[in-house]
Amino acid sequence: LGDSHHIDEGTHAYIRYNRVRVPRDAMLGQPGEGFKVAQARLGGGRVHHAMRTVGKCQRALDMMVERANSRRTQGKLLAEHQFVQGMIADSYIELEQYRLLVLKTAWAIDEVEAGRSPPVAPRTLIAMCKVQMAKVYHDIIQRAIHLHGSLGVTLELPLADWWGGVASLALADAPTEVHKIQVAKSLLKRGTIAPGLFPGEHIPTRMENLG
């Protein structure tokens, strides 16, 4: 690849086991339960990813606001262009929505640690954080890059480097699609079944039952 290319700190290593034997007294847990142990830690790791995403998106939004208040095009500040105002508003709204989801998820985990909720309670929230993570990150970083023009795609700003992490966020700790399935299954499991031929909100049936 040449001297101009390098492997950065975000690269994951390949590990290959060849006839590895583990002494019985060195085993953690029971045979076949390694995935369960890993899953116990992945939940917190996913929330950690989410928190870092909130922080980077906040930095990107701050950069957008600074750029809009400083850069002039066509005789006026970027901040005076309504399209730019819309980009900033959309980014702030999406960030605050995601921030609240992450905070609620962290609160749910604390409730489990305090013994006030069952261990499975935060799972759906964690999956929701993972699903939205890459989308919110993608949309806000993309707007920030566009607002900075050609400078946004250079390594003179952190935006291009952040942009390169969008795909990995959607894949790390299981792809987005897997977490969507988990969210849907959770809702379907708790859902109801129509009491008869028509849906539960069927107005004529409800009026008839009111008598």
Enumerate the language-model features and the residues they cover.
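Alpha-helical transition-metal enzyme core signature, strongest for iron centers
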Residues: 54, 58-61, 88-102, 130-140, ...
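C-terminal helix-coil-helix/basic helical segment that borders enzyme active sites and/or dimer interfaces
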Residues: 65, 69-76, 96-132, 145-152
